[in-house]
Amino acid sequence: MSYLFTSESVSEGHPDKVSDQISDAILDQFLATDPDSKVACETLVTTGQVVLAGEVKSRSYVDVQETARRVIEKIGYTKSEYGFDARSCGIFSSIHGQSADINRGVDRSDRSEQGAGDQGMMFGYATNETENYMPLTVDLAHHLLYELATIRKEPSSPMPYLRPDAKSQVTIEHDDEGRPVRIDTIVISTQHDEFVQASDGISEAEADRMMQERIHHDIATILIPRVKMLYKPEIAALFDEKVRLFVNPTGKFVIGGPHGDTGLTGRKIIVDTYGGRASHGGGAFSGKDPSKVDRSAAYAARHIAKNMVAAGVADEMLVQVAYAIGVAEPVSIYVNTKGRSHVALSDGQIAEKIKKIFDMRPYAIEQRLKLRNPIYEETAAYGHFGREPYEAYKTFVDEHGTEQMRIVELFTWEKLDYVNKIKAEFGLS
């Protein structure tokens, strides 16, 4: 029997994502000049104000206020009428040193035996229903908002009224084998200028209706066609005439961003991962250096699941890894192929083979995925997974105020670089 499944996403201008991006930009600044930095940075944003807090152990000096302002400006909060803008917002920092009790459990004279930064369980997931091995619901939700932000930033934007804050939600019908067969519902809520105002002959309700009609029309005729072009024909065909499209269902969305809602780092953990299709251990990612296995082990688990599915071991795979604080080796690795395995092994036997192929000690993960580089700001909006790996030039400022250019490799955990090893281990052609 068919079923409906729903995932959501939020834009880079959503207050929680503003916080995530600031936290990760500060992390990157520390890692750029001291790769061994230990960082846990939390951010709160609200009307006209940013609050930074957390713990750091580093040889670097970072101008956290200027870093935060740069991120806010890049997102698009540049006008005082937004109630939150890069140049005028107040920034308060309460970042202090890392606990020595935590640090003693992580640092080792033999770096390969570096302990996990905390206890916990982390999950990785992959499915072959899309080319990037992500659930289509969350992948589409991300693409809708990424493309909407692209439209907003275009010099001659066809939607010039757009503001940075936005949310999306996608409901897809799946057949009884879990394959997407039809897009049922798309919801887009986007912040906008008050480009039609009440005046003589136009009531406030009529002005609101006119704005909503214009935005709905533009979403349907500008945004949706552009997003369809991003997908191969069989996915684009799921956009049929029966799709229900809700645009700004409340009727008006002028007050938004941190002025409309307070934002906090780490509050969009399902958006950041698999849109609810897979389990989540509860730990957020942004603002954390890779000694925190909440982040590094979740990336490693995704890397495993994606390569295993790409190698043909299963059509779908969930990987759980768990740690004890201060201990290098994981306490457990669990696999669930949801009955969609293509090898004559139990899920437990598959997990044993994973242990042979992948070293899941924290330091080994850091080295394999190059996680001690300043690569995190780009992850903090539109999902940490399903992204294309690429090299980027990034500029950082050292403690002397000198700009440094770095070439870094982003989204290394999305590489399909273990497929051949997996095929050899499992006897797959």
UniProtKB/Swiss-Prot annotation:
Metabolic or biological pathway, per its Swiss-Prot or TrEMBL entry: Amino-acid biosynthesis; S-adenosyl-L-methionine biosynthesis; S-adenosyl-L-methionine from L-methionine: step 1/1
Class of this enzyme: transferase
Cofactor stoichiometry and binding remark: Binds 2 divalent ions per subunit. Binds 1 potassium ion per subunit.
Binding positions (L-methionine): 55, 98, 261, 292
Chain intervals for the UniProt region annotation (Flexible loop): 98-108
GO CC annotation terms, alphabetical: cytoplasm
Superkingdom in the source lineage: Bacteria
Location relative to the cell: Cytoplasm
GO MF annotation: an example: ATP binding
Swiss-Prot/TrEMBL cofactor(s): Mg(2+); K(+)
Residues that bind K(+): 42
Residues given in the record as Mg(2+) binding sites: 16
Keyword tags: ATP-binding, Cytoplasm, Magnesium, Metal-binding, Nucleotide-binding, One-carbon metabolism, Potassium, Transferase
Xref: Pfam families: S-AdoMet_synt_C (PF02773), S-AdoMet_synt_M (PF02772), S-AdoMet_synt_N (PF00438)
EC number: 2.5.1.6
Catalysed reactions, as listed in the record: L-methionine + ATP + H2O = S-adenosyl-L-methionine + phosphate + diphosphate
Residue sites binding ATP per the record: 14, 165-167, 252-253, 261, 267-268, 284, 288
Matches recorded under InterPro entries: ADOMET_SYNTHASE_CS, S-AdoMet_synt_C, S-AdoMet_synt_central, S-AdoMet_synt_N, S-AdoMet_synthetase, S-AdoMet_synthetase_sfam
Record PANTHER family: S-ADENOSYLMETHIONINE SYNTHETASE (PTHR11964)
HAMAP family membership: S_AdoMet_synth1
Subunit structure: Homotetramer; dimer of dimers.
Protein family: Belongs to the AdoMet synthase family.
Function noted in UniProt: Catalyzes the formation of S-adenosylmethionine (AdoMet) from methionine and ATP. The overall synthetic reaction is composed of two sequential steps, AdoMet formation and the subsequent tripolyphosphate hydrolysis which occurs prior to release of AdoMet from the enzyme.
Protein name (record): S-adenosylmethionine synthase
Organism: Porphyromonas gingivalis (strain ATCC 33277 / DSM 20709 / CIP 103683 / JCM 12257 / NCTC 11834 / 2561)
